[in-house]
Amino acid sequence: MGVLVGMTGALIMSGVIVVIVLAVLCASIFIVPQQQAYIIERFGKYNKVQFAGIHAKIPFVDRISTKTNMRVSQLNVQLETKTLDNVFVTVVASTQFRVNPENVATAYYELRDPAGQLRSYMEDALRSAIPALSLDDAFARKDDVAFDVQKTVGAEMARFGFTVVKTLITAIDPSPQVKSAMDSINAAQREKEATRQRAEAQRIQKIGRA
């Protein structure tokens, strides 16, 4: 009887140990999905970054502080500014950015609102670039402006662990009054060209009859 009780106690103890071991393993092993990065802290201090795959941490000592999305994000910016020839325009720009894999910790610890900071840099860069150009030049050189803005903003965001992938200026819209004036000028130019072509056609007809 005593032997049976001893065996039962041993089995219970073994079961408890197995449960504890399994619990420790479950608390230790974690999987990082594709296009994510986990920041691990040890006793509340930064320890390391883990990328996609299966990893282990020390239970009750290490913890996953944050899960960072490594995909490319997009930010759209719209602002009003004035060109060199005093035309008010609404500029619409789009920029793509992502966390630099080599600076995941910097991106997390240094910048609380990356999209807000990026928006501020974009607006400042555009307000510096567009007023230096006439309306016609702004239209003609918008790709160059976008490239310069990308370089300027990219250098600023790199300090915080972010990479600016691509920046585009998708629209430069003059005020409605300017649009109306431009339409009138274009219409007058088209009418002038049409008149010239009609006169040329009549001249050719007269020569043909002669």
Where are these regions (language model features)?
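Amphipathic, interface-forming alpha-helical segments with heptad-repeat character
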Residues: 32, 40-49, 61-189
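Long, charge-rich amphipathic alpha-helical coiled-coil "stalk/tentacle" segments
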Residues: 177-210
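Tight coil/turn sites that cap or link beta-strands
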Residues: 35, 52-54
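Single-pass alpha-helical transmembrane signal-anchor segments
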Residues: 6-29
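Hydrophobic alpha-helical signal-anchor/transmembrane segments
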Residues: 1-5
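Short linear S-[DN]-x-LW-Φ motif typified by the pepsin-like aspartic protease active-site region
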Residues: 55-61
